[in-house]
Amino acid sequence: MRETSHGARDNVDVRLRRVGATSHTEREGTHDQGPKMTRVIAGAAGGRRLAVPPGTGTRPTSDRAREGLFSTWQSLLGGPLDGERVLDLYAGSGAVGLEALSRGASHTLLVEADARAARIVRENVRNLGLPGAEVRAGKAEQVIRTAPPAEPYDLVFLDPPYAVTDDDLREILLTLRSEGWLAEEALVTVERSTRGGEFRWPDGFEAIRSRRYGEGTFWYGRAASTCEDAR
């Protein structure tokens, strides 16, 4: 999982594909309000700015929450990111996936259903110039059913709009596992509204911990290994 170096890829791989259209960006009632910005916190692109899709629908993960996410990942991995493959579903501005590349991931797939938001993710990738990014425009549940990835993912982050139910997310997690998207013991993080109560993991996943950041809570889990399934 860690043998690929962060600098091993030569080109920024930005593939914008259309597979359908609900997303981290909720389009109803949104309108242009001028550019909003966030930033990469640390790593090779630390301090660089990222554009955020205009309007009120996108909920960028705050710096504090994002720092907490990567601190927890580092603790669970036993060290900094080093060549992991990262899947960022409901990518919004792409801040989490691009933060992962900046901190040492070898590849990030950023999936976003809203076409305008996906274009901004692509612009952020190009502006940062970090290798190893791939962008797909489409609904998460459709993208993960189109074809299995060339290689499975070690870290997965899901921050869907509030309209996506816990049952919807459990179905997506089961599909990720059955369709070969998850590496052995992949770490999976789900962000949900704090007011929604406890997130229950589906069969095949082990709950690890949770962390609250204001109105959102991160739920950390791990895909069970095939050895555990066989028991």
Feature-to-residue mapping (PLM):
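Class I S-adenosyl-L-methionine-dependent methyltransferase catalytic core
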Residues: 2-231
